[in-house]
Every structure is written in structure tokens, then in C-alpha cells.
Swiss-Prot record:
EC number(s) given by UniProt: 1.1.1.86
Originating organism: Haloquadratum walsbyi (strain DSM 16790 / HBSQ001)
Protein name as it appears in the record: Ketol-acid reductoisomerase (NADP(+))
Pathway: Amino-acid biosynthesis; L-isoleucine biosynthesis; L-isoleucine from 2-oxobutanoate: step 2/4; Amino-acid biosynthesis; L-valine biosynthesis; L-valine from pyruvate: step 2/4
Binding site for Mg(2+) 2: 214, 250, 254
Substrates-to-products reaction catalysed: (2R)-2,3-dihydroxy-3-methylbutanoate + NADP(+) = (2S)-2-acetolactate + NADPH + H(+); (2R,3R)-2,3-dihydroxy-3-methylpentanoate + NADP(+) = (S)-2-ethyl-2-hydroxy-3-oxobutanoate + NADPH + H(+)
Function: Involved in the biosynthesis of branched-chain amino acids (BCAA). Catalyzes an alkyl-migration followed by a ketol-acid reduction of (S)-2-acetolactate (S2AL) to yield (R)-2,3-dihydroxy-isovalerate. In the isomerase reaction, S2AL is rearranged via a Mg-dependent methyl migration to produce 3-hydroxy-3-methyl-2-ketobutyrate (HMKB). In the reductase reaction, this 2-ketoacid undergoes a metal-dependent reduction by NADPH to yield (R)-2,3-dihydroxy-isovalerate.
GO BP, one annotated term: isoleucine biosynthetic process
Gene, per the UniProt record: ilvC
Phylogenetic placement of the source organism: Archaea, Methanobacteriati, Methanobacteriota, Stenosarchaea group, Halobacteria
Length: 372
């Protein structure tokens, strides 16, 4: 297994050559900040045609950029990409002909894909990602003579595409890990412009910051923390004799209503929108559930992300054909709340809207739904 030493010490500032691991100020790039001359005459290879891949490729093409989609022979996405009017080649051929290689396949297969395409990277080319895992944890070691950047829309691919077509934008992230040409950041911002991110704002970050905050958020709050909280609340009510249906509504279904309020206007908007009874109960009881011991566990989870413990565990799990993952996933799918919720979700009109399940990403890890 390749060593998972983190690589923040090699991240350098584009203009000054200084460490950009910790940015003192947050820079947000908009349309006026983008100079399209840094991408307009270049060819982009988009490796993968899943959630993010199809959005990047189509948005780039509609912005006048020469795009090649890189898919292995036999990929089920080849016909779809061609039907969308895009040229399709193998990943190796696409990378060989491109100036920018955007790697939009799952984290777990990126190292193998890189092995297949690295000989096609010429000095001055750009190796681009939408998530920093494999660079940050040293699973991909790029050539020293290429730029390494990140452009990561903060939404599932179908929304990135839909917003672009509507003349709107999707917020995103841009980062520079390796800048050999001196223009890596300008090119990344131009790419973000071409896929529609600078319409809303592209936030500057680093590979370390994006990777570590993304993994922590998924584990402690969004995917791990939220689902564990929902299940514990559901089980508490059911064990106390309340109906599973009522427990489902109170602990899972209504969570969306609260999150939507927080999404739209922050915590204050949520508190201002619920009843006084709900507000007082939440303010006085919430910290009894999420207490200092939970904070200590969160800090432990963050430490495991920062020092590479989680990365090593996940890499080993995949190398062993995912035994723990398979067992845990099966147990989650067998939980009573799943059987209770299925007929209840049919009561809502949005359950008939297929777009709610259209190639959704795993939180902010856009490559997770990408094809090969």
C-alpha cells in the first residue's frame, strides 16, 4: 500500500511560492475574475461520465471548450456521452491529446486510472481533481512538471448542469496543489467559469482543507452523525411504545424541513421559523444530547482524518474487497426505519420525481457517482 503521508507541505502559492496550507483570507472568484484565455484554446479530457463527469463535459462543451470524454472500452456511459454530442476515447488517449485532464472517477479507482494515463501527461499539462483525497494522502504522485489543481462544484452533477442551462451558477471550490507553469490558479478559475461556478462564486481553498473538512463533515455530521442521531431518536420513541410511523415522521421526515430552513437562512432563520415551544425545547435540551463528550469524539474523528488513520483504514478496506463496508451497509439497509419509511414516502408527491434520485453525490464528494 502506498504510504498515506499527507502532502500539505508541498502546496505552494501561485504567485509567491509560499505555503498556502492555511489561508488567512477567503478569496471568492466571480465571472469578472476569470480570464478565459487560460482555457479557451485548450483541450480538456474529462475522465468519467457519471454525476460530475457529464456536467463538466457538457458545460465545458457549451462554453466552447474542446472536450474529450475518457471512458474505458465497454463502459455503459460511452453511448450516453456520444448521444450528448461528445467525442469519446479511452482514458489514455483522451489524456494524451488533452492539455487539462479532469479526473472525475471515484476515489477508489483514481490511482489505477492515473497509472493508465500518466504517460500521456506532458510538461505544462494540468492534472485536475474534484476532491483531494488521493493527492493529499499520497495515493497519486503527479509528475513534477505538471500543474495540479482542483475545481469542485458544491452540488450534485445534475444540479450543476441544470443551473448552467438556466443561466445560473453553482458555488464551487478551486485549489492549487502544484504550480509549475505559474498560471495554474488562473487556469482553474477559467475552468470554474466555463462550468458555471463563478456565476455563483468559486471559493479558494487548499487540497488539505477541502479533503479534511469534507471527510470530517461526512463522518461526524452529515452522513455519520445525522443518521446515527435519527436512528437513536427513532428507536427511543419506538422502545417507549410510540408507533413506528410517528417516530419516523418526527425523527426523519421532519428533519428535512429543519435543514431546509438552516440551508436558506442559517440557524437564526430556523429558530425564527419554528414555534416558541420548539425553540425553547431545542435550546435547553439540544446540548444534553450533543454534549461535551460528543465534541471530544468529534475531535478524535478529526484527528483520525488529519493524521491519515481513516485514509489508511479505507484504503485497506478496499484492498480487502470491503468486508466491513459490506456488513455495515447490509445492517443499515435492514434497519426497521427503512421498512417503515418506504410506504410513508409514497404519500408525498416528490417521491414520484425521479430527479430526486438522479446520480446524487455523496455529500461534497463529486467523484463518488462517476463512471469509469
Amino acid at each position: 500500500m502506498t504510504e498515506t503521508k499527507t502532502q500539505t507541505e508541498t502546496e505552494t502559492d501561485e504567485e509567491e511560492g509560499t505555503d498556502t496550507d492555511t489561508a488567512l483570507d477567503t478569496t471568492i472568484y466571480y465571472d469578472d475574475d476569470a480570464d478565459r484565455e487560460y482555457i479557451d484554446d485548450k483541450t480538456v479530457a474529462v475522465l468519467g461520465y457519471g454525476s460530475q463527469g457529464h456536467a463538466h463535459a457538457q458545460n465545458l462543451a457549451d462554453s466552447g471548450i474542446d472536450v474529450i470524454v475518457g471512458l474505458y472500452e465497454g463502459s455503459s456511459s460511452r453511448d450516453a456521452a456520444r448521444a450528448d454530442g461528445l467525442r469519446v476515447e479511452t482514458p489514455a488517449t483522451a489524456a494524451d491529446e488533452a492539455d487539462i485532464v479532469s479526473v472525475l472517477v471515484p476515489d477508489t479507482v483514481q490511482p489505477d486510472v492515473f497509472e493508465a494515463i500518466q504517460d500521456g501527461l506532458d510538461a505544462g499539462d494540468t492534472l485536475q481533481f474534484a476532491h483531494g483525497f488521493n493527492i493529499h494522502y499520497n495515493q497519486i504522485q503527479p509528475p513534477a512538471d505538471v500543474d495540479v489543481t482542483m475545481v469542485a462544484p458544491k452540488a450534485p452533477g445534475h444540479l450543476v448542469r441544470r443551473n448552467y442551462e438556466a443561466g445560473e451558477g453553482t458555488p464551487g471550490l478551486v485549489a492549487v496543489y502544484q504550480n509549475t507553469t505559474g498560471t495554474a490558479r488562473k487556469e482553474a478559475v477559467a475552468y470554474a467559469h466555463a462550468i458555471g461556478c463563478t456565476r455563483a462564486g468559486a471559493i479558494e481553498t487548499t487540497f488539505r482543507e477541502e479533503t479534511e473538512t469534507d471527510l470530517f463533515g461526512e463522518q461526524a455530521v452529515l452522513c455519520g452523525g445525522a443518521t446515527a442521531l435519527v436512528k437513536q431518536g427513532y428507536e427511543t420513541l419506538v422502545d417507549a411504545g410510540y408507533s413506528p410511523e410517528m417516530a419516523y415522521f418526527e425523527c426523519l421526515n421532519e428533519l428535512k424541513l429543519i435543514v431546509d430552513l438552516m440551508y436558506e437562512g442559517g440557524l437564526s432563520e430556523m429558530w425564527n421559523s419554528v414555534s416558541d415551544t420548539a425553540e425553547y425545547g431545542g435550546l435547553t435540551r439540544g446540548n444534553q444530547v450533543i454534549d461535551e463528550s460528543v465534541r471530544e469524539e468529534m475531535e478524535s474523528i478529526l484527528e483520525g482524518v488529519q493524521d491519515g488513520t481513516f485514509a489508511r483504514e479505507w484504503i485497506s478496506e478496499n484492498q480487502a474487497n470491503r468486508p466491513s463496508y459490506t456488513q455495515l451497509k447490509a445492517a443499515e439497509e435492514a434497519h426497521e426505519i427503512e421498512a417503515v419509511g418506504e410506504p410513508l414516502r409514497d404519500l408525498f408527491a416528490w417521491s414520484d420525481n425521479e430527479e430526486t434520485n438522479d446520480e446524487s453525490d455523496v455529500v461534497s464528494e463529486p467523484e463518488a457517482a462517476a463512471d469509469d
